[in-house]
């Protein structure tokens, strides 16, 4: 009954009585009024905040304002609501406009509603106001309950009013205005007795004539109902419910608490309420059993109509999509005209579940109770996501009936079945941040956030930094879940994701404006890493899968687990969440529809698979192809070896088949790349072609020798990827099912990269040979030839490119030239792959006869499997420098071989190409024989030596060189030089012989091949080869550890025999051989060696130095400068604590003599190059000698992976081995030439050859040799250079000041030409030129050529690969420190290492000149520009003027005048091979 005001009531009654309206028109009018009700006005915040009142002055029959409850404690089922004593008389304050009037006494009740309405009309006062009251109790009434029913009780003036407390009324003398009671029920009230309560309520008695006190009493009485008392004088003696005597109520009107329904729960007792009757007492409709008055009947009909409309509303479908509020926004925060009308507003939970039927009409069956999963969604009106989940849960039975296999996702709730606390969206203008329910101000308008939101909208992968202002977190969560399941380095990315420049700026912005103002580092933020959204989004959505990235990131952040343990936890999380992320149906198949309905992370692939159930989607096929590639090339299990019979060896594939498969993989990679470029229109648009995403090989090169099937599977998978990419290009525009997204293309690129990096050693890191064997390229090369040859070459190409048919040649040879044998047939054919053609036009195809044993590359002669192993291992080496040392078939010298023209050409090798000359050999001289190549077996057929190839089945195709035929041999008649190397004797090697001594157990470096270990030189030949004054006697045993070195020495014995009975000629000690043997003169005694530094020199770099050929008398070629690869120059610069640039003295191109490393040798440091003679033997000899003496050798390896020699030294894990990268790019002047402020800074870390590595080595050295002098690896005194200065063409720098004065000053003694004297002494030259002292005053102070020391910045492993200076995030104070710092030359000073993440805690060191020595500023010339460095004044402490820096420190640092080096913090030593001293249990050198 809308708008029931006091002045309107008599008019309404008179209108009804005068027109004699029936019941039906009134019902229709009430129904229309019910369906067209309006929205409530805004709540009274003043009264509502007191938790005492509900809605103030709200019209009747309107829903209450929904306010979320503060999660009240659940009431025990069936328990009674507890009532607060203070709430018994709670009331509402009067309106401010109400006039002050004394309370009037309550008259007797009127006999009926009509009389009551007339009495209201006759006794209304003009000053009377009205008031909305509501009671609040812990158990029953809560003013903030979102599900409240308007229980409107209209009373007349003068009726019994509750006595309000003094705190309830603003004014003390205000009269009690007219009461309008609105009871609010708590969501935590008991629902177990709902049906019983409804039955006890009878036929829907109206609540308009009942007071809140009877509601409370009836609520406590279970099924009790208060009967209407008879109209007698005894009614005046009924005590009040509060226990206090109240005014008697006379007359024959019903009491103020008659027939109160349970839905009116206020928890307040009003005076004058009669005591509740027993539950069994009937409730007559009228005292005395008569009919109700006409007014009461009308009210009952209206109440029934209202409840019937509520029942219809519950059966209506969900509102249209347009009425729903947008995600993350409450509908009650919308403007009033845009708020959706809630059909359930104003109804209690009992009425929602069980609507009442219309009384005295057709009885309707009560609606079935709503599902339990949807109850919390109806209560949580502010969560649109929860409402959507509830709607899905409510429609679960219907969906299950039509699709029984559909996976039903249930939201994750609390154990009590309630939504998680804090699930409500944050208030307007705020976003989630911090603990449960906390939020912060939104920063949507900040430029950094705007740019980040645009990047997030376009990103396909998870963004490395996420903030709530960027948009909906669903996309980020799904991408993170995908990444956790698919990425190999998921935890590393979550903890330390690589940030670009923009993401780095965003991360700094978040740290400065979001995290820093809100607490310390352990402050609760709701997400443990930058990429993770707030956990509140997952809690609000009830999505358990979204907790997976949080769990993975939490484990990744923990320091309590190592890498292996974290990997186990990650795998456990993947298995635990697998069924949730990839649901399966009852048959165990992946249920794509369930993935769509449950978790949208797999929605795209599932939708495609549903559209094409007969064939997997392209994205699925891409993933399967990538999986097959990884499985085919991954580490092979030992099951095949275990299945073989005992005592038998598994058959190994031939070298020809391995080359065929390697070329097939190269062509497959090329085909995929071409398809990708055509699809995306360029390489820059292809995802995954990033240097940072290059994967590591799937298996070591040696594993490919026994896995030909894996190579074939990988090639076939790549061709399948090529087909998928082509379909996407041709059909993707018209058919969306063939399209490939960025994730699929990235996976395809990664599959190609995995194959390429794994197969690269097999093709010797060169794809030209495979390209020449492509059929289309062969024909193209033929048609583009010159006119005179185009016809013949095209015909030859067509004949050569005939389809290969192995079945036609069962006993002869294959199209590639390899004999077809049973083993080849067992290996399988390549008919499923595109054909590989043997050669290019213009070359004769090889036709090798059955006597193919003449070719050592493709046969198994005598040695059997050993020869095949040697060939296989040779084909899979990773050293590009040793390509020229590979053994290739050469021109046969026997008459039988010369009779066949095919044997005289290079094409005797199957599958050879025009590129083979560049790969396998060098241009030959007139004799047609390279000096470093061994003799062929045919040339030794008539030899009478004891090591002939036919004697013991020796295969000369081993990885070591035999003595080649000299160009000029002065040989006596009948003399034939023996072969230096032969097979290993059956009885075992002699201890004085030459062979490899490979230690037992595990090694830091790859173990040599079986063929290298099988090479042997007899002791009598060893003694003759090493007996030369070129080799110091103490180091001669090292030569016996290296058969390769012995073969090289034998190849240089080209002179006449040194004495009678000698088997070899006299050794010709040429310049290159002397340079390769110079290392033996560094340390005379091998016992004094404690540290070995391994490096790979650049071209023409060696320790002998010498004048370059550009100078008069020079014979040495000028070395090549490289900005990327470091050689001997970079090694000495790091050991000498100086910066390497192309113009500095440290570069080998500026040397005029040999560098002096005697200071390092005095400490026991041996510098060993991969090009030195017996490099492998020296390392293994030192390891064996020191290990036998129970000493550990400290090995520092600066050799890159691609430069590691073939069959390099095996270093046992008993010794200490440290590896680091050597590159000139550590100097900021080389890496970023334009950054002038960093020209004297050098980057360092534990992975770079520099102070970071040296600190680890010095600590290990101190543990190994506690009684020795400490190791000093980064000192200026370690290295001295021989360069051209004004003191001479070959001046050793730094030249001491005393020696400088002795050599330079006498030339100008008595010179009258002051200009010549100034120019000769360099008075006006810069003090330092390219870091070295140049002017006279600088040379007179520190020495000529003394260099400035750099400032080392500890950048960590990630900073070592920085491309731009901004990626290092250098603090401004540190950058200024590097600009003004000038570390004067000091031969014994330690390196100055500063952390790159902190501001320096000391003043920048300067150079100060005493008066009388010229200008106080120091001039430094670098890269053609001169810089003036001002000294540090003594009178100013903080700011010294231009060029200085203001330092802000917490603790006072050293005094400005003290030039002392910063003490470096202790660096953690992370050496895998470190062991306790004196432990011999793992020493492989002790028998």
From Swiss-Prot:
GO cellular component: host cell nucleus
Family: Belongs to the herpesviridae ICP4 family.
Protein name: Major viral transcription factor
Region (Disordered): 41-295, 310-370, 803-1007
Keyword line: DNA-binding, Early protein, Host nucleus, Phosphoprotein, Transcription, Transcription regulation
Residue ranges with Pro residues bias: 66-75, 273-285
Native organism: Equine herpesvirus 1 (strain Ab4p) (EHV-1)
Main location per the UniProt record: host cell
């Amino acid at each position: 009954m809308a708008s029931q005001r006091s002045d309107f009531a008599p008019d309404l009654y008179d209108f009804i009585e005068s027109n004699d309206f029936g019941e039906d028109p009134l019902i229709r009018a009430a129904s229309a009024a019910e369906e067209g009700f309006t929205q409530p006005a805004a709540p009274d915040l003043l009264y509502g905040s007191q938790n005492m009142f509900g809605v103030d002055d709200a019209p009747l029959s309107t829903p209450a304002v929904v306010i979320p409850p503060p999660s009240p404690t659940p009431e025990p089922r069936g328990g009674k609501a507890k009532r607060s004593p203070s709430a018994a008389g709670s009331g509402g304050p009067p309106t401010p406009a109400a006039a002050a009037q004394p309370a009037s006494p309550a008259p007797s009740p009127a006999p009926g509603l009509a009389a009551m309405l007339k009495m209201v009309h006759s006794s209304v006062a003009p000053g009377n106001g009205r008031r909305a009251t509501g009671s609040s109790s812990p158990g029953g009434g809560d003013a903030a309950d979102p599900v409240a029913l308007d229980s409107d009780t209209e009373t007349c003036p003068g009726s019994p009013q509750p006595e309000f407390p003094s705190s309830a009324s603003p004014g003390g003398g205000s009269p009690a205005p007219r009461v309008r009671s609105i009871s609010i029920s708590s969501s935590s009230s008991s629902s177990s007795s709902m049906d019983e309560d409804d039955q006890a309520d009878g036929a829907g008695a109206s609540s308009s004539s009942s007071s809140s006190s009877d509601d409370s009493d009836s609520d406590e009485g279970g099924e009790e109902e208060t009967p209407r008392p008879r109209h007698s004088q005894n009614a005046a003696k009924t005590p009040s419910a509060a226990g206090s005597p109240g005014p008697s109520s006379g007359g024959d009107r019903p009491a103020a608490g008659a027939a109160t329904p349970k839905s009116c729960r206020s928890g307040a007792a009003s005076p004058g309420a009669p005591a509740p009757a027993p539950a069994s007492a009937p409730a007559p409709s009228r005292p005395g059993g008569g009919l109700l008055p006409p007014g009461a009947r009308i009210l009952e009909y209206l109440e029934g109509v209202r409840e019937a409309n509520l029942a219809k509303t519950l059966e209506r479908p969900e509102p249209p999509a347009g009425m729903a509020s947008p995600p993350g926004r409450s509908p009650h925060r919308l403007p009033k005209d845009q708020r959706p009308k809630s059909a359930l507003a104003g109804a209690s939970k009992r009425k929602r579940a069980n609507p009442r039927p219309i009384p005295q009409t057709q009885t309707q069956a009560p609606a079935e109770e709503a599902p339990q999963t949807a109850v919390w969604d109806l209560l949580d009106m502010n969560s649109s996501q929860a409402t959507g989940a509830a709607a899905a849960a409510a429609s679960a039975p219907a969906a299950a009936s039509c699709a029984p296999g559909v996976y039903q996702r249930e939201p994750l709730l609390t154990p009590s079945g309630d939504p998680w606390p804090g699930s409500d969206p944050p208030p307007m203008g705020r976003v989630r941040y911090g603990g449960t329910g906390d939020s912060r101000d939104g920063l949507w308008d900040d430029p950094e956030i705007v740019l980040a939101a645009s990047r997030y909208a376009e990103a396909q992968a998870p963004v490395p930094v996420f903030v709530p202002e960027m948009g909906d977190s669903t996309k980020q969560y799904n991408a993170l879940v995908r990444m956790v399941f698919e990425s190999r380095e998921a935890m590393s990315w979550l903890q330390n994701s690589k940030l670009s420049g923009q993401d780095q700026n965003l991360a700094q912005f978040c740290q400065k404006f979001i995290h820093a103002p809100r607490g310390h580092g352990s402050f609760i933020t709701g997400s443990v890493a930058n990429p993770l959204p707030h956990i509140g989004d997952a809690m609000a959505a009830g999505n358990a899968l979204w907790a997976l990235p949080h769990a993975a990131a939490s484990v990744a952040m923990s320091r309590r687990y190592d890498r292996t343990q974290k990997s186990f936890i990650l795998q456990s999380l993947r298995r635990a969440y697998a069924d949730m992320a990839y649901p399966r149906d009852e048959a165990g198949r992946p249920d794509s529809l369930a993935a769509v309905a449950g978790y949208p992370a797999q929605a795209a692939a599932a939708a495609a698979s549903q559209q094409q159930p007969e064939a997997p989607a392209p994205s699925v096929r891409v993933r399967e192809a990538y999986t097959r590639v990884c499985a085919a090339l991954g580490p092979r299990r030992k099951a095949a070896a275990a299945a073989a019979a005992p005592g038998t060896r598994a058959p190994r594939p031939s070298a020809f088949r391995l080359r065929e498969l390697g070329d097939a993989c190269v062509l497959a990679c090329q085909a995929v790349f071409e398809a990708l470029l055509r699809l995306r229109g360029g390489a820059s648009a292809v995802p995954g072609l990033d240097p940072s995403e290059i994967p590591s090989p799937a298996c070591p090169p040696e594993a490919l020798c026994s896995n030909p099937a894996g190579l074939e599977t990988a090639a076939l998978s790549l061709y399948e990827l090529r087909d998928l990419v082509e379909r996407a290009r041709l059909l993707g525009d018209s058919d969306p099912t063939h399209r490939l997204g960025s994730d699929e293309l990235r996976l395809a690129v990664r599959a190609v990269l995995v194959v390429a990096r794994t197969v690269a050693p097999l093709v010797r890191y060169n794809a030209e040979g495979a390209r020449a064997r492509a059929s289309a390229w062969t024909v193209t090369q033929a048609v583009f030839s010159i006119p005179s040859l185009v016809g013949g070459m095209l015909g030859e190409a067509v004949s050569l490119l005939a389809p290969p048919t192995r079945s036609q040649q069962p006993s002869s040879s294959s199209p590639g030239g390899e004999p077809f044998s049973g083993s080849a047939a067992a290996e399988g054919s390549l008919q499923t792959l595109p054909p590989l053609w043997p050669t290019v036009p213009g070359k004769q195809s090889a036709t090798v006869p059955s006597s193919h044993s003449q070719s050592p590359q493709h046969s198994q002669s005598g040695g059997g499997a050993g020869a095949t192993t040697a060939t296989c291992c040779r084909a899979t080496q990773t050293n590009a420098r040793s390509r020229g040392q590979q053994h290739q078939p050469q021109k046969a010298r026997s008459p039988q071989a010369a009779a066949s023209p095919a044997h005289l050409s290079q094409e005797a090798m199957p599958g050879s190409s025009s590129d083979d000359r560049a790969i396998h050999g060098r241009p030959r001289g007139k004799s047609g024989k390279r000096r470093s190549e061994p003799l062929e077996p045919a040339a030794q057929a008539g030899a009478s030596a004891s090591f002939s190839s036919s004697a013991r089945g020796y295969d000369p195709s081993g990885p070591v060189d035999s003595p080649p035929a000299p160009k000029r041999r002065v040989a006596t008649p009948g003399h034939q030089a023996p072969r230096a190397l032969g097979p290993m004797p059956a009885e075992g090697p002699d201890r004085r012989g030459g062979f490899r001594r490979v230690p037992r157990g595990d090694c830091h470096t790859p173990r040599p091949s079986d063929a290298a270990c099988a090479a042997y030189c007899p002791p009598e030949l060893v003694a003759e080869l090493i007996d030369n004054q070129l080799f110091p006697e103490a180091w001669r045993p090292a030569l016996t550890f290296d058969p390769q070195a012995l073969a090289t020495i034998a190849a240089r014995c080209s002179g006449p025999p040194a004495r009678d009975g000698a088997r070899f000629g006299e050794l010709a000690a040429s310049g290159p051989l002397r340079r390769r043997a110079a290392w033996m003169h560094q340390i005379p005694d091998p016992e004094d060696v404690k540290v070995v530094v391994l490096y790979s020199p650049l071209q023409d770099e060696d320790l002998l130095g010498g004048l370059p050929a550009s100078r008069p008398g020079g014979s040495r070629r000028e070395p090549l400068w490289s900005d990327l690869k470091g050689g001997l120059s970079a090694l000495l610069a790091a050991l000498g604590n100086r910066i390497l640039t192309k113009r500095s003295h440290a570069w080998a191109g500026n040397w005029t003599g040999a560098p002096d490393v005697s200071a390092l040798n005095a400490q026991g440091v041996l510098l060993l190059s991969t090009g030195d003679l017996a490099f492998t033997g020296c390392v293994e000899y030192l390891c064996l000698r020191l290990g036998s003496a129970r000493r550990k050798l400290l090995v520092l390896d600066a050799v890159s992976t691609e430069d590691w020699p073939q069959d390099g030294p095996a270093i046992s894990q008993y010794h200490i081995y440290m590896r680091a990268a050597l590159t000139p790019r550590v100097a900021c002047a080389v890496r970023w030439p334009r950054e002038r402020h960093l020209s004297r800074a050098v980057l360092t870390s534990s992975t770079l050859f520099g102070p970071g590595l040296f600190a680890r080595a010095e600590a290990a050295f101190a543990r190994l040799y506690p009684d020795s002098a400490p190791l000093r690896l980064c000192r200026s005194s370690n290295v001295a250079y021989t360069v051209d200065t004004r003191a001479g063409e070959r001046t050793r720098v730094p030249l001491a000041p005393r020696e400088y004065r002795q050599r330079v000053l006498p030339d100008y003694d008595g010179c009258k030409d002051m200009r010549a004297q100034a120019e000769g002494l360099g008075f006006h030259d810069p003090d330092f030129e390219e870091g070295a002292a140049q002017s006279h005053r600088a040379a007179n102070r520190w020495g000529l050529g003394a260099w400035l020391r750099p400032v080392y910045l500890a950048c960590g492993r990630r900073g070592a690969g920085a491309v731009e200076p901004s990626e290092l995030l250098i603090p401004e104070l540190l950058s200024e420190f590097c600009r003004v710092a000038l570390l004067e030359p000091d031969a014994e000073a330690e390196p100055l290492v500063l952390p790159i993440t902190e501001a320096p805690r000391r003043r920048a060191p300067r150079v100060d000149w005493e008066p009388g020595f010229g200008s106080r500023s120091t001039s430094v010339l670098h890269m053609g520009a001169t810089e003036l460095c001002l000294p540090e004044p003594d009178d100013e402490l903080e700011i010294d003027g231009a060029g200085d820096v203001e330092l802000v420190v917490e603790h006072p640092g050293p005094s400005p005048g003290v030039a002392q080096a910063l003490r470096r913090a202790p660096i953690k030593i992370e050496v895998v091979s470190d062991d306790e001293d004196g432990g011999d249990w793992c020493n492989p050198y002790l028998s």
